[in-house]
Design a protein with these regions (language model features):
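C-terminal substrate-binding/catalytic lobe of Rossmann-fold NAD(P)-dependent oxidoreductases
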Residues: 4-140
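A conserved FAD-binding loop/helix module that cradles the flavin
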Residues: 143
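Short alpha-helices
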Residues: 1
């Protein structure tokens, strides 16, 4: 099903930087600011590729991952874009079936935002089709 390159953009709050404080993790630097870090070479790219291969053994396309530092303390807001010929209804059913036993993952039929997940264990996922492109949006509170 996934036979095309995957583009992932993810914006993380300051808590996504881990427990080790750094110059870019402080409010005074992040306030009213946004920046890219480790584009195309982030340490999580191999993990993302491994997860996709576990779901679809034939997956061997590129993963272009662009992480951003956001102007908020908690959460990760991520988008993924890939060419996909499968109809939206079938994709929503696949996602709903896959996460049916996971009480914290919710497939949502309208747009999502971080305020819906901050201070919760929830992961929200929203799917949209635009022509032959699939847009997957997800958000979590990463604390």
């Amino acid at each position: 099903m996934l036979n095309e390159d995957v583009m992932v953009n993810a914006i993380t709050g300051s808590t996504g930087a881990g427990v080790k404080p750094g110059a870019t993790s402080h409010f005074s630097w992040r306030n009213n600011n946004m920046s890219i870090y480790k584009p195309f070479s982030h340490q999580h790219v191999p993990e993302i590729k491994q997860s996709l291969k576990q779901l679809q053994n034939s997956f061997d396309s590129e993963i272009d991952f662009i992480p951003y530092r956001g102007d908020f303390p908690r959460g990760i807001f991520a988008t993924l874009v890939v060419k996909c010929k499968v109809e939206l209804e079938e994709l929503v059913k696949m996602y709903t079936d896959y996460y049916a036993e996971d009480s914290f993952v919710h497939i949502i039929d309208k747009n999502i935002d971080l305020k819906q997940v901050v201070n919760t264990n929830k992961c929200l996922i929203h799917l949209e089709k635009h022509g032959d492109k699939l847009l997957i949006i997800s958000c979590i509170d990463n604390c």
